[in-house]
Regions:
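Short, well-formed alpha-helical segments that are part of the catalytic scaffolds
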Residues: 7, 12-27, 320-321, 343
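A short, conserved alpha-helix in the catalytic core of glycosyltransferases
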Residues: 171-174, 179-229
Length: 399
């Protein structure tokens, strides 16, 4: 087996379905040499039965679903599958990602060319096509962490002194060594990952990727950034400014300092806890206003997006729109008839929040390239999968 892909799921069955469908579109590698292990952390949305139904033995990829009876957390669930997979390479992959047809081929080529490597990451794009800064990170030393927490890194993002956390001084288009690879897409040799004993299970949700990347560096390996794009919905699916997120994230950072920078952990404990309280306070300020707005205008809690659909399955899309009471304009097209996609001159994009591409008519690489060419922050990617009758956006899913 060439490649084993591990996906940890918790109540996001449609994202997992879409992710696996994108893997199955991979070119340049034999699909019979790829296996997918989904570790379900005791989801309540019928994920296990849904995924087993979607991906039977006849599916081009071997898909195994492990059903846990409790939520083991990210690291422990990944390790659970790591000890069962058989591939030469292992890819830890978030469920809210979409690969292009070339992603696996390009990263595996890099892996074969760099036996000195620990793990590889990729260029992650947010749903508006903009670059996700988490794609490349520097080692969070006490100084780097201080710059991030105080905002110095935001003031001087492209300097090595202050902006090392996100390494924005590096060229996005170049294959380059980095310190930290995101756990959303982390590929490495199985034997090396087993030697490192996988993820540290002291972390529950955040920080595991930082810890593993650092341990690989300490062991003499090098981590790399491969400038091939994937879609990652994290900006939409993770509430970064809730108290829970802030608390768990900074606690994970403190665990990292305590483990790897023990002397610094003592004097860092106070500012880290102050940062948690400050950011938690700032995250709570908007909540009463949102509650009042949603009470006075319940529709504002889940606004109906104005969608432009590009593809050949207009009838199915109209039926889906009618079921959900949403407005979708239809442009009958494919990649051949509309080579510039939604960027074609003459298409008025102003009314639309979502540009939904039909995945049967447009390659994933085509879609991501068009959004990456002109990200605006106003319009976001939608993906319609006609065989599954599934429309996925960052904030809502329509079936």
């Amino acid at each position: 087996m060439l490649l084993s892909i591990i996906i940890v799921n918790y109540n996001v069955r449609y994202f997992v379905e879409q992710c696996i469908l994108s893997v199955a579109r991979s070119k340049g590698i034999p699909l019979e040499e790829v296996e997918v292990f989904v570790v379900d952390n005791h989801s309540s949305d019928h994920s296990v039965s849904h995924l087993r139904h979607c991906f039977p033995a006849s599916f081009p990829l071997r898909v195994e679903v492990i059903a846990n009876r409790q939520n083991l957390g990210f690291g422990r669930a990944n390790n659970q599958a790591l000890h069962q997979v058989t591939g030469k390479y292992v890819l830890f992959l978030n469920p809210d990602t979409v690969l292009t047809e070339d992603t696996l081929h390009e990263v595996l080529q890099a892996a074969e060319s760099h036996p000195e490597a620990g793990v590889f990451g990729v260029k992650m794009l947010q749903s508006d096509g903009s670059f996700a800064k988490e794609s490349r990170r520097g080692l969070p030393t006490p100084w780097t962490a201080f710059c991030r927490m105080t905002g110095l890194g935001n003031l001087f993002p492209k300097t090595r002194l202050f902006g090392n956390y996100y390494m924005q001084f590096l060229d996005l288009t170049q294959f380059t060594p980095i310190d930290i690879v995101s756990g959303a897409f982390m590929l490495g040799e199985r034997e090396k990952l087993l030697k490192m004993e996988g993820f540290d299970e002291d972390y529950f949700m955040y920080g595991e990727d930082i810890d593993l990347s650092y341990r690989l560096l300490q062991a003499g390996f090098h981590n790399f950034y491969v400038p091939t794009p994937i879609l990652h919905y994290k900006g939409e699916s993770t509430r970064k400014y809730t108290y829970r997120y802030v608390h768990v994230f900074y606690q994970a950072m403190f665990i990292f300092f305590k483990k790897h920078f023990h002397r610094s952990a003592i004097w860092l404990s106070v500012p880290i806890r102050l940062a948690i309280l400050l950011k938690a306070f700032l995250s709570l300020i908007p909540l009463p206003f949102h509650a009042i707005r949603n009470y006075l205008n319940p529709a504002s809690a889940h606004p109906s997006p104005h969608i432009l659909y590009l593809g050949r399955s207009g009838t199915a899309v109209r039926e889906l729109a009618a079921r959900h009471g949403i407005h979708i304009d239809i442009l009958d097209a494919d990649a051949t008839s509309l080579p510039e996609g939604h960027l074609t001159k003459g298409i008025d994009l102003k009314p639309y929040l979502i540009i939904a591409y039909d995945t049967a008519d447009f390659p994933f690489r085509f879609i991501l390239n068009r959004f990456e060419t002109a990200p605006t922050g106003k319009r976001h990617i939608g993906l319609f999968h006609p065989d599954a009758q599934l429309l996925v956006t960052g904030k809502r899913i329509f079936t």
